[in-house]
Amino acid sequence: MKRRDLLRHIWQHGCYLAREGSRHSFFVNPNNNKKASVPRHREINDYLARRICRDLDIPAPKA
């Protein structure tokens, strides 16, 4: 999955960018205060994308 597609999915579910690290972006779900880091790669493994969504407590993206 492309990183931009995952970020679009995260933003559509109400999460926001908390901060930028050197190699990761950190997102927060304001509904439940869950946090997750998203690596800065062009392609993100589908398993990792599902894991990030699970950490943020949002539905998994469609493949």
In which residue ranges do the predicted regions lie?
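Charge-dense, helix-prone N-terminal extensions
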Residues: 1-18, 48-55, 61
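Basic/aromatic recognition patch in beta-strand/loop cores that engages polyanionic ligands
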Residues: 7, 11, 15-35, 39-41
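C-terminal structural segments of small proteins and small subunits
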Residues: 30-36, 40-63
